[in-house]
């Protein structure tokens, strides 16, 4: 599907149907955490107009398997909402996913409030210009994201 999409031959209905099937499967298999190992949940969001949340669902499921609690803000999360949750919950890590460059604006990272303890800011997806996001860590895959988050919570 991804290769066809890159060639401009992708059928949007196939992509959307497969995405919904995968998200449903990830939600069904997500473990209900009764005693998470982190006292402050990790924040997962897609900034700007980003609608592609499948990576967030996969990360949330992988973290649940590790007994790590998350706040899942999902698609199209405005910077004002991200900032409010960061101030209110002081997450140990913030993971932001951007598929499109128009959503991977490096200014989002610097616009997050400065709090103590400072959360580890993690960026995933092809939409980020890594060289412009010096204050964040770019993660290359699901295992890398889980490893960085596990370190951030001190586990």
Name what the model sees in each region.
Residues 1-30, 34:
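Long amphipathic alpha-helical segments
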Residues 40-43:
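Conserved hydrophobic helix-helix packing surfaces used for dimerization/oligomerization
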Residues 57-72:
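Short helix-loop-beta junction
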Residues 78-82:
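Short acidic active-site motifs
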Residues 86, 90-91:
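Proline-aspartate-enriched helix->loop->beta-strand connector
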Residues 98-99, 125-126:
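Short secondary-structure boundary segments
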Residues 118-125:
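Short, hydrophobic beta-strand segments that form beta-sheet elements in well-ordered domains
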Residues 126-155:
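Peripheral docking tails and interdomain loops at the edges
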């Amino acid at each position: 599907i991804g290769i066809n999409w890159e060639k401009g031959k992708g059928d949007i209905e196939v992509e959307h149907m497969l995405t919904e099937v995968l998200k449903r499967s990830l939600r069904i298999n997500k473990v209900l955490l009764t005693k998470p190992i982190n006292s402050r949940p990790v924040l997962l969001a897609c900034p700007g107009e980003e609608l592609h949340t499948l990576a967030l669902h996969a990360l949330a499921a992988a973290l649940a398997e590790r007994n790590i609690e998350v706040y899942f803000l999902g698609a199209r999360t405005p910077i004002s909402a991200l900032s409010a949750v960061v101030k209110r919950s002081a997450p140990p890590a913030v993971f932001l996913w951007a598929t499109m460059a128009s959503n991977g604006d490096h200014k989002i990272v610097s616009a997050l409030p400065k709090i103590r303890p400072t959360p580890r800011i993690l960026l995933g997806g092809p939409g980020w210009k890594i060289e412009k996001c010096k204050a964040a860590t770019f993660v290359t895959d699901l295992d890398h994201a889980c490893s960085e988050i596990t370190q951030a919570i001190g586990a």
